[in-house]
Amino acid sequence: TSADIIAEPWFNYQRDCLKHIAEEAQLARIIVVTSGKGGVGKTTTSAAIAMGLAKKGHKTVVIDFDVGLRNLDLILGCERRVVYDFINVINGEASINQALIRDKNCNQLYILPASQTRDKDALTQEGVGKVLEELSKEFDYIVCDSPAGIEKGANLALYFADDAFVVTNPEISSVRDSDRMLGILSSKSRRAERNEEPIKEYLLLTRYDSDRVKSGEMLGLDDVQEILSL
């Protein structure tokens, strides 16, 4: 299939997905976590992936691309320690080391928060590319927490990805939005432009309830596969 489907809670999929990524990684690997709509658990998934990799001994940084609506710092409990942010680094107002926040509970995990006050247009392909290139020299994995949908921040996060987790709920509208994201991943990435190996895609189903599937209240795996033609 073009995408691997994981119908497990986010804390279980490390076994299935991160093992594959870790085994193949030689250079810094860029992982994007995205979704077609908000409220599906995307940022929680980003934090879980980053923490999982860091706890396995991989030096990992997770970047919040959601300019103006950041909450990755809240989930990781470092919101009071934010001094500089992603946009400050892109604009040359701070160095990467000044903006990075080291997780208090995991020495291998760092956070680069989004700006809460800047406009999304402050993100540029050139600026994001330079920051990712610099981080690649210091880290094993770069996890990009993308905004939902296809806004500028999301497109930039997707563009540089090596691996992508598309997070969705087992609802028709959410799954169809995910289909659109899979299309963007296959056609608008740096890998696609360079005719390189395609981004490795994972479709993560959150809020999956087997009892509700049996009662017909929720889409099942077969339904999702049919909608996405997987």
Regions found by a protein language model. Give the residues of each.
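Conserved catalytic-core segment of NTP-binding enzymes
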Residues: 136-137, 141, 147-230
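P-loop/Walker-type NTP enzyme "switch/lid" segment
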Residues: 22, 65-137
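Extreme N-terminal, non-catalytic leader segments
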Residues: 3-37, 58, 98
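Structural motif
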Residues: 59-61, 108-111, 142, 164, ...
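Flexible glycine-/small-residue-rich
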Residues: 35, 64, 113-116, 168, ...
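Short, conserved glycine- and acidic-residue-centered signature motifs
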Residues: 42, 46, 124, 128, ...
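Walker A/P-loop NTP-binding active-site region of P-loop NTPases
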Residues: 30-93
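Residue-level signature of catalytic and energy-coupling elements of molecular machines
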Residues: 38, 89, 112, 145, ...
